A protein has these predicted regions:
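Bacterial N-terminal signal peptides
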Residues: 7-16
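Active-site segments of SGNH/GDSL-like serine hydrolases
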Residues: 139, 157-187
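Catalytic His-Asp segment of secreted/periplasmic serine-dependent ester chemistry enzymes
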Residues: 176-286
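Conserved SGNH/GDSL esterase-like catalytic core that processes O-acyl groups on lipids
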Residues: 28, 45-150, 223, 249
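Loop/turn elements at helix/coil->beta-strand transitions in domains of secreted/extracellular proteins
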Residues: 49-52, 127-133, 161-168, 196-199
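Positively charged n-region of N-terminal signal peptides that target proteins for export
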Residues: 1-4
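Short coil-to-helix leader/linker segments, especially the first N-terminal amphipathic alpha-helix
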Residues: 21-47
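Stable alpha-helical elements in mature extracytoplasmic
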Residues: 31, 35-38, 116, 120, ...
Length: 286
């Protein structure tokens, strides 16, 4: 009961500041397209190869369950998702689907924003990405104080912007026995997105919207399941997004509420496609 009450409190707090919106455009209580003109200015300084898309993060990003599966199968994908995929497929630098994985590309397990801060200059020099998705925080919950987390994240984002790289920020998923703390770190990311005028993928809010009472795969109600094969949005460890076999690469509404990686892949694809359109990097669709 205590866990349910905590989850409801977090959800109500988020709902109070989030307007009704679809998963792919959830950006908190921010004006529509608040980031478009600032990011156009950033992109005007970009000098690298178009279509390069870096993904800076921890184990939730380095895994081949994230991003790469979109290239191969999209069962039950809604029309707007297939349109977004076709646009992205025609634009994305091919190695960014699968090969930009590992520490030298800015994603590795067990890492925090401290690691990103220490290495961001090298990543930007090596990759010079047109757009970068950034999601750190899950490991920071038990090792990096919130004030330091926010300070270092702002520095990482600023370094990207200064180099001409457009940033997409992502909130982190809720976490077993650390729900309130994960919510606070996600709020910090929303504040950074607002202040620095960068687009946001609010993974945390979408998980709570879809599964307000039972997002946590570590809950006893899911004791019969193992590992990532849990039909809710977090795996049995209560840390990573779930990836149950029956919902892998499935983008039906049922799957988006039952497979954490399907939900994240959908949200990132749609936001990346929106950024491409709003920055006039791809032809307008009629």
């Amino acid at each position: 009961m205590r866990r349910i009450c905590s989850a409801l409190l977090i959800l109500l707090t988020i709902s109070a500041v989030l307007p009704a919106s679809t998963a792919e455009d959830r950006e908190g209580n921010l004006p529509a397209d608040y980031w478009v003109e600032p990011m156009k200015q950033v992109h005007s300084r970009f000098t690298g190869r178009k279509g390069t898309f870096a993904q800076f993060g921890d184990s939730i990003t380095v895994t081949l369950a994230f991003w790469t599966p979109l290239l191969y199968e999209r069962r039950n994908a809604p029309k707007e998702m297939e349109q977004a995929y076709a646009m992205v497929k025609s634009y994305l630098h091919e190695p960014c689907w699968r090969q930009w994985k590992g520490g030298r590309f800015g994603n590795a397990g067990s890492q925090t924003v401290r690691w990103a801060h220490q290495n961001i200059d090298a990543w930007l020099e090596r990759l010079n990405p047109e757009i970068a998705l950034i999601m750190f925080g899950t490991n920071d919950l038990h090792s990096v104080p919130l004030e330091e987390y926010e300070k270092l994240m702002r520095r990482v984002v600023q370094k990207c912007l200064d180099s001409g790289t457009v940033v997409i920020l992502s909130t982190i998923p809720p976490r077993h026995r650390m729900a309130e703390k994960a919510a606070a770190y996600s709020t910090a990311i929303r504040n950074i997105a607002r202040d620095m005028k960068v687009p946001l993928t609010d993974f945390h809010a979408e998980i709570l919207k879809r599964r307000p009472d039972d997002w946590d795969g570590a809950d006893e109600k899911f004791a019969q399941y193992n590992g990532y094969d849990v039909p809710t949005l977090l795996a049995r460890d209560g840390v990573h997004p779930s990836h149950p076999k029956q919902y892998q690469s499935d983008y039906s509404e049922k799957a988006l509420s039952s497979c954490g990686f399907s939900l994240r892949n959908y949200m990132v694809l749609m936001k990346y496609a929106k950024v491409l359109k709003k920055l006039d990097l791809v032809p307008s669709q009629t």
